[in-house]
From Swiss-Prot:
Gene3D superfamilies to which the protein is assigned, alphabetical: Zn peptidases
Residues binding Zn(2+) 1: 68, 101, 164
Details of cofactor binding: Binds 2 Zn(2+) or Co(2+) ions per subunit.
Family per similarity comment: Belongs to the peptidase M20A family. DapE subfamily.
Name of the gene encoding the protein in the UniProt record: dapE
Entry function: Catalyzes the hydrolysis of N-succinyl-L,L-diaminopimelic acid (SDAP), forming succinate and LL-2,6-diaminopimelate (DAP), an intermediate involved in the bacterial biosynthesis of lysine and meso-diaminopimelic acid, an essential component of bacterial cell walls.
UniProt organism field: Neisseria meningitidis serogroup C / serotype 2a (strain ATCC 700532 / DSM 15464 / FAM18)
Stored SUPFAM superfamilies: Bacterial exopeptidase dimerisation domain (SSF55031), Zn-dependent exopeptidases (SSF53187)
EC number(s) per entry: 3.5.1.18
Residues annotated as the enzyme's active site: 70, 135 (proton acceptor)
Pathway terms, separated by semicolons: Amino-acid biosynthesis; L-lysine biosynthesis via DAP pathway; LL-2,6-diaminopimelate from (S)-tetrahydrodipicolinate (succinylase route): step 3/3
NCBIfam families noted in UniProt: dapE_proteo (TIGR01246), PRK13009.1 (NF009557)
Enzyme class, UniProt record, top EC level: hydrolase
CDD domains linked to this entry: M20_DapE_proteobac
Name of protein: Succinyl-diaminopimelate desuccinylase
Length: 381
């Protein structure tokens, strides 16, 4: 494919060092470009986070692209083969921080909109973009706040495409139609500090927690289902002791995380953890944090349309999957009837020398345009 506008826009976005939550006027660039084809822009800024809601049209159905202009830090710049914010083309790839996650996706959707509107100026429904500068950070003032605003005025989304990098081996091979929930625990096991030679005068929290730890790691939380793998329990950190070899620690800190399917609930997992700890007589404090509930878009119109657009452009059949981490889709699903994630390869995200294949860029834009055409121009699936 010879289309180069997507590449040029991606390079312009990558050249702006928008490390979370700094937007570096990326959203302003998008608004200026889309204003030319009839999009109205609404800036929704909260704290140091910039968000923008761009919309063309007032009627349903609403097809929305969601993405983020912020990127993660570069890591050691000297380890990059080229400066991370100076986009470079070499070896058939585009290099730069944000190339895969997710400035290329944003560029491709903008150019898809430009071509689609030029061909269908009186298209059905509405096209929207929800863009934030706080996805890679705390995600407290970004998409979730915009969703609150839209929900309050009953402005809902029929079909949402989140431009997260989803491809595994080749562009279009995977569509995310759901994500697992994420529930974290910060557990403090209480003991009594003492001299290691006098254990009868102390309570070792490592020892008291050990039986519960074994049970927690061996528990079958659920069996998963057609769309989700079984819920997983993983410990990320265990810390205890003073560093000395002759002191029994007074406390043990354990951090753990559930990635849970729709077969489990936040409340149910909490109850079962507390029951196991209580069963083993553990004295503890436990603080919980849930960063997202599981969500699922059943195979239907949006997945069918996306698969058809991928087949037409890429010549492959896309797999539906719910694997991987969380995304802003967990917030948008509250106002979106159907939601998928679809973008370039995820092989180098957050890494040194992050990149995308150059020949994937016009293809991704064509896939997005094909989705718009099938949803808003009556093109056959």
């Amino acid at each position: 494919m010879t289309e180069t506008q997507s590449l040029e826009l991606a390079k312009e976005l990558i050249s702006r060092p928008s490390v979370t939550p700094d937007d570096r006027d990326c959203q302003k660039l998008l608004a200026e470009r889309l204003h030319k084809i009839g999009f109205a822009a609404e800036e929704l800024h909260f704290g140091d986070t910039k968000n923008i809601w761009l919309r063309r049209g007032t009627k349903a159905p609403v097809v929305c692209f969601a993405g983020h202009t912020d990127v993660v830090p570069t890591g050691p710049v000297e380890k990059w083969d080229s400066p991370p914010f100076e986009p470079a083309e070499r070896d058939g790839r585009l290099y730069g921080r944000g190339a895969a996650d997710m400035k290329t996706s944003i560029a491709c959707f903008v150019t898809a909109c430009e071509r689609f509107v030029a061909e269908h100026p009186d298209h059905q429904g509405s096209i929207a973009l929800l863009i934030t500068s706080d996805e890679e950070g705390d995600a407290l003032d970004g998409t979730t706040k915009v969703v609150d605003v839209l929900k309050a005025r009953d402005e809902l989304i029929d079909y949402c495409i989140v431009g997260e990098p989803t491809a595994v081996d080749k562009l279009g091979d995977m569509i995310k139609n759901g994500r697992r929930g994420s529930l974290s625990g910060n557990l403090t096991v209480k003991g009594k500090q003492g001299h290691i030679a006098y254990p009868h005068l102390a309570i070792n929290p490592v020892h008291t927690f050990a039986p519960a730890l074994l049970e927690l790691t061996q528990e079958v939380w659920d069996e998963g289902n057609e769309y989700f793998p079984p819920t997983s329990f993983q410990i990320s950190n265990i810390n205890g002791g003073t560093g000395a070899t002759n002191v029994i620690p007074g406390e043990l800190n354990v951090k753990f995380n559930f990635r849970f399917s729709t077969e489990s609930t936040e409340a149910g997992l909490k109850q079962r953890v507390h029951a196991i700890l209580d069963k083993h007589g553990v004295q503890y404090d436990l603080q919980w944090s849930c960063s997202g509930q599981p969500f699922l878009t059943q195979a239907g119109k949006l997945t069918d349309v996306a698969r058809a657009a991928i087949a037409e452009t890429c010549g492959i059949e896309a797999e539906l999957s719910t694997t991987g981490g969380t995304s802003d889709g967990r917030f948008i699903k509250a106002i979106a009837k159907e939601l998928i994630e679809l973008g370039p390869s995820n092989a180098t995200i957050h890494q040194i020398n992050e990149n995308v294949r150059l020949d994937d860029i016009p293809k991704l834009s064509a896939v997005y345009e094909g989705i718009l055409a099938r949803l808003l121009a009556g093109n056959a699936v």
